[in-house]
Swiss-Prot record:
Keywords linked to the UniProt accession: Cleavage on pair of basic residues, Disulfide bond, Hydrolase, Metal-binding, Metalloprotease, Protease, Secreted, Signal, Virulence, Zinc, Zymogen
Co-factor binding comment: Binds 1 zinc ion per subunit.
Compartments where located: Secreted
GO cellular component: extracellular region
Propeptide residues per the UniProt entry: 20-189
Cofactor: Zn(2+)
Name of the protein: Probable neutral protease 2 homolog MCYG_01991
Length: 363
């Protein structure tokens, strides 16, 4: 497999590199059990149990164990999903620290509690339904020897019903709040807030946007004729799937390009305290805001030299798909990395941010 980063959309060069072999990481269907219970007006307790006969190291990133205000559960009211106000983060998936994992012995359980009013708009009150589903990356071993992802554990929790007191829910402080945009400091490159940038950060971000636009445009052009690759990543080659892929990638390319003023605001540095350990960048989808974190600049190459490797360009592309002004409905984090993303169903893959980044990386 080759990585072909085609920059012809913006009149640049073509970079080609040989891909490294992708290790097998099987999806374990029912190794863990998750039970939800209500412990207050909007407080939820999740009990995670290892049903298997081997110890598990469960990666916390973008799962129900995540300590950051990411999407841990789905909340519905009258059949419609309640607005999510938290952050959608892209994490660095190499060099993982043991601190990022929760270890569960066979048949053991761990509890995680969180207030869904901190990451959802529940100010209307009334009856809601809460559930959780997804996959948790797993590693074998303990400590520093147990940080290499070797599999993925699928889960689907029970559903619980809550009758939310609107006044109490409104009194809960939102985890991410509202960002105050700086007037007079906007660069017409997807509205970069230059007041948050050093020159080196601005140069890196502009380069990432340039490459994001080129990769997205090249992938959009390739999708209708590269059906085997579309099927590999999106699990469908229907006309509707192809049209959705092309439309969304073209939208990302347009938003990333130099000549657009853009609908998103991009910050070079953290403005909402979302840059916790392991976070490369994050998006506030309800505000159409993207923020880069320090390790975006220090730990990522501008463009990857192998397939499925994280870089600045595809991280920016990934984050673009989280914004409702770019992709509607915006994409979520349903599967992370090649093995996890390609285990999704067609319906999930088309809504998964990393699927677009991975597809663009190899198109």
């Amino acid at each position: 497999m080759q990585l072909i980063a085609t920059l012809s959309a913006l009149g640049a060069l073509v970079a080609t590199a040989t891909a490294a072999a992708v290790p097998s990481a099987p999806v374990k269907q029912s190794v863990i059990d998750i039970q939800l219970s209500a412990t207050g007006n909007t407080m939820i307790k999740a009990t995670i149990t290892n049903k298997g006969d081997q110890a598990l190291n469960l990666l916390q990133f973008n799962t129900i164990l995540d300590k950051n205000p990411t999407r841990k559960v789905r909340v519905y009211q009258n059949g419609t999903e309640v607005k999510f106000t938290g952050m959608l983060a892209r994490y660095k998936m190499t060099g993982l620290s043991p601190d990022y994992f929760t270890t569960l012995s066979p048949k053991a359980s761990v509890e995680s509690s969180f207030d869904i009013a901190r990451t959802h708009d529940l100010t209307r009150g009334g009856k809601i339904t809460v559930m959780a589903s997804g996959t948790i990356p797993t590693a074998e071993g303990h400590g520093a020897n147990g940080t290499t992802i070797t599999g993925y554990a699928k889960y689907e929790s029970n559903k619980i019903e809550l009758d939310v007191d609107a006044k109490k829910a409104a009194s809960v402080v939102q985890a991410m709040g509202t960002v105050k945009k700086s007037p007079g400091s906007i660069d017409k490159r997807t509205n970069i807030d230059t007041s948050t940038c050093t020159q080196s950060q601005l140069d890196a971000l502009e380069g990432a946007l340039y490459n994001s636009a080129a990769l997205a445009q090249a992938a959009a052009q390739a999708a209708p004729s590269n059906l085997d690759t579309v099927a590999e990543y999106f699990k469908s080659t229907s006309r509707r799937t192809i049209n959705t892929i092309v439309s969304r990638l073209q939208s990302v390319a347009s938003e990333s390009t130099y000549v657009n003023s853009g609908s998103t605001t991009y910050y070079c540095t953290d403005v909402m305290n979302g840059c916790q350990p392991g976070v490369l960048a994050y998006t506030l989808p309800d505000q159409n805001i993207i923020t880069n974190c320090p390790i975006y600049y220090s730990d990522l190459p501008a463009l990857a030299q192998s397939c499925h490797e994280q870089d600045q360009a595809t991280t920016t592309l990934h984050e673009m798909t989280h914004n409702s002004a770019v992709v509607s409905p915006y994409c979520d984090d349903l599967g992370y990395g090649y093995e996890d993303a390609t285990s999704l169903s067609a319906g999930q893959a088309i809504q998964n941010a990393d699927t677009y980044a991975l597809f663009a990386n190899v198109s």
